[in-house]
């Protein structure tokens, strides 16, 4: 499940400003 989700996120997230910062806060 997470494998498929991560593939989608890896394609979409780089195009969304502030995503990296958000992920760093979550982790």
Curated annotation (Swiss-Prot):
Tissue-specific expression: Expressed by the venom gland.
GO CC, any one term: extracellular region
Localization terms from the record: Secreted
Subcellular location, principal: secreted
GO biological-process terms attached to the record: defense response to bacterium; killing of cells of another organism
Disulfide bond annotation, renumbered to this chain: none
Keywords from the UniProt entry: Antibiotic, Antimicrobial, Cytolysis, Hemolysis, Secreted
Known function: Antimicrobial peptide forming an alpha-helix in watery and membraneous environments, enabling it to perforate membranes. Active against Gram-negative bacteria E.coli DH5alpha (MIC=5 uM), E.coli MH1 (MIC=0.6 uM) and P.aeruginosa PAO1 (MIC=10 uM) and against Gram-positive bacteria B.subtilis VKM B-501 (MIC=0.6 uM) and A.globiformis VKM Ac-1112 (MIC=0.2 uM). Has cytolytic and hemolytic activity.
Sequence similarity: Belongs to the ponericin-Q family.
Name by which UniProt lists this protein: M-ectatotoxin-Eb2a
């Amino acid at each position: 499940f997470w494998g498929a989700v991560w593939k989608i996120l890896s394609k979409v997230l780089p195009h969304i400003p502030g995503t990296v910062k958000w992920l760093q806060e979550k982790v």
